[in-house]
Amino acid sequence: MQVVVIGDSIIDSYLWGKVERVSPEAPVPIVSVIKRENRPGGAGNVSVNLRELGATPYLFSVVGDDDKGKKFKKLLTEAGISIDGIFEDSTRITTVKSRIISKGQHIVRVDEETTENIDSARETLIISAIGKLLDNRKIDVIIFVDYDKGVITPTLFSKVNEMAISRGIPTAVDPKKRNFHSFKNVSLFKPNFKEFTEGIGIQLDKNDFAAIKNAADSFRQKQNIKLLFITLSELGVFIGNGAEEKHYPALIRDISDVSGAGDTVISVASLAMAASLDQKTIAFMSNLAGGLVCGKTGVVPVNKNQLINEMKEQNI
């Protein structure tokens, strides 16, 4: 499958170390660094997941005209992902999330980022480049990966979504708060529970599936969403398309780190939807894939062979 990915570029940076003493300067641990590592995050991680699953991703994003932007592009190239759709902006910095980890536990996370919307010039560049790609490639699905860092604007989404609808290409969205209500007329909308409740402005009990169903159905109809997919972390997922609204529990497993699980879920769900799989299979596959990456520390893509083996064991 060929997939267009649009969204925020992030470098997930890790300092792995050990803590053996407390600082004499303040009551904080001293971490002796053993290893440093950088990985593509955000829309980059979705692209890596897609490639690991056998798809061809075309990523469109904006980075700063800085060393970290060059690093991000190098990480993509090393992962076998084209950087033709990565545009630079000297007025922005490339987003970096730096995590310090000891014995599998996060000590602290430090974010360096720009959150303002991209300018109209970059907006136009991305829209034009995507239009040309759609004219020359058979694209199976378009995924919008929004981390509220400014790449996805209401105008960019609207223009690209119109192109997708006119060509019969399904669209999937992994939203954040800022543009939550801008995403209308999409094929798949995948917030987590916190994003969903904040987005609709209603407090819900995560265990009250009847209330979630009512709120989800109302929102889905209002936004004209074909398939609404809400992840509920340890409780599994809720998925509904109007004809069927159902909760699917999570498989019990050890959780090491939830970072990047949402990227994996939107990747698997989008491919499954584009392949016209049924709602139950989409839910189980995505649920399973998200759980697999939660068993590893840091932002990592799903392993295709491991996913296939687990699916066979679960008779999916």
What are these regions (language model features)?
Residues D135-V151:
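Short acidic, glycine-rich surface-loop motifs adjacent to enzyme active sites
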Residues S9, Y147, T264:
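Active-site metal-binding loops of divalent metal-dependent hydrolases
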Residues G150-E245:
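Conserved phosphate/ATP/ADP-binding segment of small-molecule kinases
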Residues V3, P24, V28-V96, E310-K312:
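Substrate-binding N-lobe of the ribokinase-like
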Residues I86-R92, R99-N136:
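Conserved phosphate-binding/catalytic loop of the ribokinase/pfkB sugar-kinase fold
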Residues K222-K226, L251-Q314:
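Conserved post-catalytic alpha-helical subdomain immediately downstream of the catalytic base
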Residues M1-E20:
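Positively charged, low-complexity intrinsically disordered leader regions
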Residues V4-I6, R109, D140-I143, A172, ...:
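Structural motif
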